[in-house]
Swiss-Prot record:
Annotated organism of origin: Mus musculus (Mouse)
Pfam families hit by this protein: CCDC85
Subunit text: May interact with ARVCF; CTNND1; CTNND2 and PKP4.
Gene: Ccdc85a
Biased composition annotated in UniProt, kind: Gly residues: 372-381
Record protein name field: Coiled-coil domain-containing protein 85A
Source taxonomy: Eukaryota, Metazoa, Chordata, Craniata, Vertebrata
PANTHER family, alphabetized: COILED-COIL DOMAIN-CONTAINING PROTEIN 85A (PTHR13546:SF13), RE60986P (PTHR13546)
Key words, A-Z: Cell junction, Coiled coil, Methylation
Length: 500
């Protein structure tokens, strides 16, 4: 069409121009405005030219319109791309918005939970603070009480240490049978009474004299001839008749009250008559050595260390046939009652106190060392016969030791080990002395002398060191009982309340 227009344009130009006077369509802008009469007046060439010209104009308008449409389409494509991008961005923003909404909901729930937890925690904190305040106040009170108890225990331990030091000094001085040991013993008891709040019970078998023990040395001072240390040491070293008088240990002498003025009292001081010796010496050798449970010092630790009420019923004076059977002093009986732990059986079976034995059997330190080294090797036997204190694990001793601290417990166990050792020595000494007395003098000479009646022939074979050591041990136990409530309660729980 454009080619036709291009071809028609030169043709129109080549055509002869119309007459000037005629109305040509050159001046006409639009053919539509030309009427039909005017078109009929035109020639063919004019019509062709006007037609070609109108066609060219329309073609150019169409080209412009197509270009415009093309541009619009291009712009439309650009706008569509932008719209797609905006849609994607909007989708992403919507997703982000949803996530933010979920996060806000989660944070709000978490905030609500945090509020609830904080309220619960505050409530728990207030309750815990109140409980801790009460507990701390209670524990502070207990701590104060424990501090007071600790101070009391420390004070008691210091007093016990001082007491042990004084006892060791007294043992080192070694005034065996003299009055100085009794005086030092009285001073120690006064120290214990002033240092400890506990008062020693009456008749607990301790070293100090009491109103419950009628055979204490304060009541028997007039039994000894002189009462001086020289008088106590002289009869034991020389073996004079005065010595045999004071060595008399008949039951009448042990059970007689010291203030009686009857003639039997002077007889008890001089010793039993031969008629009284004969029925007692006709039995077995054990009966000659132990005519009565209160007549020989070796029975002392055996009867002292048994503390059951049944044993007390068996050994009361004037009792059942079991009493007479136990009074024979057989080795089985001695071994049976050798592992007790009470002091109250001493006045029951013996009828006397350790101070009474101290006046009759106490010896000087020189005599103690001489008889201990010459008898049966007592110095070397101390290490072999010493048994550890841990072997004594009976329920009886556990009850006694439950109220003691460690230092007092170890000290008392050492004393008990010493008692066992002295028991072994005491049991071995009379056997050798009885064999010597019966083999050397025959039957009549050994039965008629007061020394053979008690089971001892010569001063070197007498058990004064053993008896003195036993008295020292019992005195220490009594002093320890005054300072320790556990021992004191055990020793004074079963006091001798029968007639002396």
């Amino acid at each position: 069409m454009s080619k036709a227009a291009g071809g028609s344009a030169p043709a129109a130009e080549s055509c002869p121009s119309a007459p000037a006077g005629a109305s040509t369509p050159t001046g006409v802008d639009d053919l539509s405005k030309v009427t039909d009469e005017e078109l009929l007046q035109w020639s063919k060439e004019e019509l062709i030219r006007s037609l070609r010209r109108a066609e060219a104009e329309k073609v150019s308008a169409m080209l412009d319109h197509s270009n415009l449409i093309r541009e619009v389409n291009r712009r439309l494509q650009l706008h569509l791309g932008e719209i797609r991008g905006l849609k994607d961005i909007n989708q992403k923003l919507q997703e982000d918005n949803q996530e933010l909404r979920d996060l806000c909901c989660f944070l709000d729930d978490d905030r609500q939970k945090g509020k609830r937890v904080s309220r619960e925690w505050q409530r728990l904190g207030r309750y815990t603070a109140g409980v801790m305040h009460k507990e701390v106040a209670l524990y502070l009170q207990k701590l104060k009480e424990l501090e007071v108890k600790q101070e009391e225990v420390v004070k008691e331990n210091m007093e016990l240490k001082e007491l042990c030091m004084l006892l060791d000094e007294e043992k080192g001085v070694g005034c065996a049978g003299s009055r100085c040991s009794i005086d030092s013993q009285a001073s120690l008891c006064q120290l214990v009474a002033s240092a400890t709040p506990y008062v020693r019970d009456v008749g607990d078998g301790s070293s100090t004299s009491s109103t419950g023990s009628t055979d204490s040395p304060d009541h028997h001072k007039h039994h000894a001839s002189g009462g001086s240390p020289e008088h106590l040491q002289k009869p034991r070293s020389e073996g004079s008749p005065e010595h045999t008088k004071h060595r008399s240990t008949s039951p009448e002498h042990l059970h007689k009250p010291r203030a009686s003025g009857t003639p039997d009292h002077s007889k008890a001081l001089k010793g039993p008559s031969p008629e009284h010796h004969k029925p007692l010496c006709k039995g077995s050798p054990e009966q000659q050595r132990h005519p009565h449970p209160g007549s020989s010092p070796e029975v002392l630790p055996k009867h002292v260390l048994s503390g059951s009420p049944e044993h007390f019923q068996k050994h009361r004076p004037g009792g059942s046939p079991e009493h007479t059977r136990h009074s024979g002093g057989s080795p089985e009986h001695l071994q049976k009652h050798a592992l007790g732990g009470s002091l109250e059986h001493l006045p029951r079976a013996r009828g006397t106190s350790p101070e009474h034995l101290k006046q009759h059997y106490g010896a000087s330190p020189d005599h103690k060392h001489a008889s201990g080294s010459g008898g049966s090797g007592g110095g070397s036997r101390e290490g072999t016969l010493r048994r550890p204190a841990q072997e004594d694990s009976s329920s009886h001793h556990r009850n006694v030791y439950s109220g003691m601290n460690e230092s007092t417990l170890s000290y008392v166990r050492q004393l008990e080990a010493r008692v066992r050792q002295l028991e072994e020595e005491n049991r071995m000494l009379p056997q050798g002395s009885f064999r010597l007395s019966s083999g050397a003098d025959g039957n009549n000479s050994s039965l008629n002398s007061p020394a053979s009646f008690s089971g001892h022939t010569t001063p070197s074979q007498q058990p004064e060191p053993v008896v003195h050591s036993l008295k020292v041990v019992w005195r220490k136990l009594g002093d320890a009982a005054g300072s320790c409530p556990g021992i004191r309660q055990h020793l004074s729980g079963n006091q001798y309340k029968g007639p002396m």
